C-alpha cells in the first residue's frame, strides 16, 4: 500500500448513516463538510449548547446511544479524557448487536493504550486531522484540503482501509491535502511527543527568557513580551516553517540570527535529545496513559495546581496588562 493518499472514492460511505458523536471543535466541521459532500449525517450529543447548535444548523440530533443505534458509521469526536466512559456506557453495548459497523477516531490515544477495545465485528479506523477545526474550515472555504493520518486497528469487514480513505475524502482532507498511512500507536506517540517535548520546552524557554531579561537585566516587561512572542513574529516564523521548511525559512532572518540559531541548536541538541528520548519511552510504554488516568481519577490536582502557577506568574500578569493596552482578548 502507498504511504500517501491524495484522493479516494466516497462510494463506501454512500447510502450509510454516519453519526458524528460530539458537535464541538472537530465534530461541527466534519459534519458540515460531509453534508456538503452529499453524505447522510446525524449528530449524537449530550443536551448542551452544542446539541442546540447542531439542531439550529439543520441536523437531526439524538442522544449518543440513539445516534449509534441509527448509524452504520460513527465518528467519536469527543475529548480523549471522557471518551472511555462515554464509550463504555453509551456505545459499547450497542456495538455488540451490530452485524457490521465502522468506528472512526480522530486520535489514536484511547485505542493505542488499550482504554477502548471495540468488539471484533467493528471496523476500527482512524482519520486524524493535523489541525484544529477552525483551520480546517478556513481551508475548506478556500477550496483546499488538509493533512490527516490514517490508521486501521481492526479490519472486520475487509474494507476498513477503503472506509478510512473515504472518510478522509468525506471530511474534505483530500483531494487538495494529503492522507498519510499511519497507525493508532504512531499518531498517539507523535501527538504526545509534541505536547511533552518541543511545546513545553518552547513555553519554558520563553518564560525563562522573560524572567532573566526582566529580573536580572532590568528589561521592561512590555519590551520582553513583544520580542519573545506578543508582536506576532513567532506566528510568522511558524507560517514560514510550514510553507518553506524549518531551515529554508532561515534565509528570511539576518546572518547574525542564523549563526546564533544554528550554533546554539547544535550546542544544546544532545541535551534536548535525551529529554525527547525519555519522554518518548514514557509515552510508548503506556506510563503517561497511566499517569493521566490516575490524575483524572484524583480530580486533576496537579493539573489545577500547575495552571494556577502559570496564570499567577509575573509573565502572565505582565501579558494581561500589555494585551489590555493592545486591545487584545484578555481572560479573567
UniProtKB/Swiss-Prot annotation:
Limits of the KARI N-terminal Rossmann domain: 1-182
Enzyme Commission identifier(s): 1.1.1.86
GO BP annotations listed: isoleucine biosynthetic process; L-valine biosynthetic process
Domain KARI C-terminal knotted: 183-329
SUPFAM superfamilies, per database record: 6-phosphogluconate dehydrogenase C-terminal domain-like, NAD(P)-binding Rossmann-fold domains
Family of this protein: Belongs to the ketol-acid reductoisomerase family.
Protein name (database record): Putative ketol-acid reductoisomerase 3
Organism of this sequence: Saccharolobus solfataricus (strain ATCC 35092 / DSM 1617 / JCM 11322 / P2)
Lineage of the organism: Archaea, Thermoproteota, Thermoprotei, Sulfolobales, Sulfolobaceae
Record gene name: ilvC3
